[in-house]
């Protein structure tokens, strides 16, 4: 199981770096910051499916 440490988030502004992650909602997030903010918004229901595009 792939995991991402989101303890540093949410951050108000995410960088533009592109390191895609695929969430359990089948959406591709452009980087860890955007993914972690979505995890926080989902109250922890969103998980990482795998690294890379969905």
Swiss-Prot record:
Q: Which residues form the signal peptide?
A: none
- List the glycosylation sites: 43
The principal location of this protein is secreted
> Which cysteines are cross-linked by disulfides?
6-36, 14-33, 22-54
One cellular component GO annotation, for this chain's record? Answer: extracellular region
Q: Per its UniProt entry, which superkingdom is the organism in?
A: Eukaryota
Keyword tags:
Disulfide bond, Glycoprotein, Protease inhibitor, Repeat, Secreted, Serine protease inhibitor
Q: Kazal-like domain: from which residue to which, for each copy?
A: 4-54
Q: Which InterPro entries match?
A: Bifunctional_prot_inhibitor, Kazal_dom, Kazal_dom_sf, Prot_inh_Kazal-m
Q: Does the keyword Disulfide bond apply?
A: yes
List site positions: Reactive bond 3.
Answer: 16-17
- Name the SMART domains on file: KAZAL (SM00280)
| GO molecular function annotations of the record | serine-type endopeptidase inhibitor activity
* Localization: Secreted
The text the record gives for the protein's domains is:
Avian ovomucoid consists of three homologous, tandem Kazal family inhibitory domains.
- Indicate what this protein is called per its UniProt record: Ovomucoid
């Amino acid at each position: 199981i792939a995991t991402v440490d989101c303890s540093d988030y949410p951050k108000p502004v995410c960088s533009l770096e592109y390191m895609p992650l695929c969430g359990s909602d089948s959406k591709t997030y452009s980087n860890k910051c955007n993914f972690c903010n979505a995890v926080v918004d989902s109250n922890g229901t969103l998980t990482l499916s795998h690294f890379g595009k969905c």
